[in-house]
Design a protein with these regions (language model features):
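A structural signal for alpha-helical segments
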Residues: 2, 36, 40, 66-69, ...
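Pan-zinc metallopeptidase signature
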Residues: 45-145
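Post-HExxH zinc-binding segment in Zn-dependent metallohydrolases
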Residues: 3-46
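Active-site metal-coordination segments of metallo-dependent hydrolases
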Residues: 1-10, 106, 110-113
C-alpha cells in the first residue's frame, strides 16, 4: 500500500542517516544487509503473487481438485524459495513463519502489497538528494500536483 511503502522507505533512510551521523558504520552495514534481505524477500513475494494470479486466472478451466493441487504445488514452491533465501543468508530462523506456517492468498496478497512501492519511494529519496525536507516536499507534491 502507498502509505506503508512510504513509511518503510522513509524509516530505512532515516535510520541510515542517523547511523551515519553517529559514526556507527558497523551497525549501518548490518542494517543495509537487513534491507537487502528484505528486498530479496519482497521480490520472492512479488513473484509468488504473480504466479498465484496465473493459477486463479486459469481456474475456470480446471476442476476443483486440480486447482487445489496447483495451489499446493505453488505453496511448496514458495516455501522452497523462502528456504533458499534462508540458506543464502546463512540463517536458521529467517522467514520461519513463512516456511513453517500457513501460506494463503490473504497473507501473500497483504504482504506483497504492503511492500510493493518501497522501490518507488526509495527512488524518490535518491531524487531528493537524500535530504529529508526535499523528500517530504516531493511526496507532498505527489498528492497535490
Amino acid at each position: 500500500m502507498f502509505n506503508e511503502s512510504f513509511a518503510t522507505a522513509f524509516a530505512r533512510q532515516g535510520v541510515q542517516l542517523w547511523l551515519k551521523e553517529k559514526g556507527e558504520f558497523e551497525k549501518l552495514t548490518k542494517y543495509q544487509d537487513t534491507i537487502k534481505r528484505e528486498d530479496e524477500f519482497r521480490e520472492v513475494l512479488q513473484q509468488a503473487k504473480s504466479k498465484l494470479g496465473i493459477i486463479y486466472k486459469n481456474a475456470d478451466d480446471a476442476p476443483e481438485d486440480i486447482l487445489h493441487k496447483r495451489k499446493q504445488l505453488f505453496i511448496q514452491s514458495f516455501k522452497t524459495s523462502c528456504l533458499n533465501l534462508r540458506k543464502m543468508w546463512k540463517s536458521k530462523k529467517a522467514l520461519k513463519g513463512w516456511i513453517e506456517g500457513e501460506v494463503n492468498n490473504a497473507k501473500l496478497g497483504a504482504s506483497s502489497v504492503y511492500l510493493s512501492k518501497v522501490p518507488y519511494f526509495t527512488e524518490l529519496w535518491m531524487q531528493s538528494g537524500e535530504d529529508p525536507k526535499n523528500y517530504l516536499e516531493l511526496i507532498r507534491n505527489l498528492n497535490n500536483p
